[in-house]
């Protein structure tokens, strides 16, 4: 099957380019070095100094052809609907939900696939929306393609990881992942979803159709995985054993219905980072606002 992330088709109009800048922190610092993770994450990150910020630019290719970009939110509908909103107790979920930026659909799209491999086997229609329709059948094989109306540029050595919205399963269709070398590539890319069966799916107006975030090129080659017994690191083992004993004691108390444990509901000592309600990612802004942020200037 063809690559899931590819250059946009040739009929994409190349018009006046506008750019939207973003400040991307490349490192953060702890307010208090002792305020580290007790069992999972106790870190409270302070804003990085302005000189450590780098730009992630989204060049708008054509006048009148755009799409909303927002920091990925912490909330998910299925998490909201769960009993007592229990999934929000999982810190890894909350952090992952917010890791990146989402591109939103500009149309209410209905797509139907008949199960065949031809591109004619996928029918796409707009049920309403503004601007050009960015969704169509191009590759066949049950792949639904969203045209992205931006050309992204990252600093040297940085790629973009492009995928579907995190922890947001969609019945009947699956987002395909891709990594774009946006520090040198001067071609656009498409976001693609592949049907898992012959069916009809819909994407609502402002529904996320793409999530992206920067990743440093070559970082995998910097690591060498190795196996060790936990007892090889006595301090690390001691911390784990204390956590494990505490967790087992808590779960035993729940099972036995101990009032003080039931009243507590769940252990919260690893949830410090989740108390920070601010999005992890900075919102996109026009280039003048970004430049003022870098220099510390004020004003509209």
How should each PLM-predicted stretch be described?
Residues 1-185, 199-300:
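Non-catalytic terminal segments and appended small domains
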Residues 184-192:
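Aromatic sugar-binding surface patches on proteins
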Residues 193-198:
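Short alpha-helix capping/helix-loop boundary micro-motifs
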């Amino acid at each position: 099957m063809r690559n899931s992330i590819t250059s946009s088709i040739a009929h994409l109009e190349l018009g006046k380019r506008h750019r939207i800048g973003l400040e991307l922190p490349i490192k953060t610092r702890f307010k208090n070095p002792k305020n580290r993770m007790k069992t999972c994450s106790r870190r409270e990150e302070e804003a990085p100094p302005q000189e450590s910020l780098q730009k992630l630019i989204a060049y708008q290719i054509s006048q009148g052809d755009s799409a909303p970009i927002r920091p990925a939110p912490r909330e998910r509908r299925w998490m909201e609907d769960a009993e007592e909103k229990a999934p929000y107790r999982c810190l890894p979920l909350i952090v992952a939900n917010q890791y990146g930026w989402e591109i939103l659909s500009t149309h209410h799209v209905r797509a139907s696939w008949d199960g065949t491999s031809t591109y004619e086997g996928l029918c796409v229609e707009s049920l309403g929306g503004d601007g050009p329709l960015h969704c169509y059948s191009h590759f066949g094989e049950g792949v639904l393609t969203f045209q992205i109306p931006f050309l992204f540029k990252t600093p040297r050595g940085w790629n973009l990881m492009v995928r579907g919205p995190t922890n947001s399963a969609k019945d009947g269709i699956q987002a395909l992942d891709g990594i774009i070398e946006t520090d040198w590539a001067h071609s656009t890319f498409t976001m693609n979803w592949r049907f898992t069966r012959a069916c009809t799916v819909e994407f609502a107006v402002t529904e996320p159709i793409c999530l992206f975030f920067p990743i440093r090129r070559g970082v995998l080659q910097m690591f060498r995985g190795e196996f060790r017994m936990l007892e090889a690191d006595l301090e690390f083992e001691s911390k784990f054993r204390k956590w494990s004993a505490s967790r087992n004691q808590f779960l035993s108390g729940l099972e036995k219905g101990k009032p003080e444990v039931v009243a507590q509901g769940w252990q919260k000592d690893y949830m410090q980072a989740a108390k920070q309600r601010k999005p992890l990612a900075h919102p996109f802004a026009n280039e003048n606002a970004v430049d003022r942020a870098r220099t510390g200037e004020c004003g509209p």
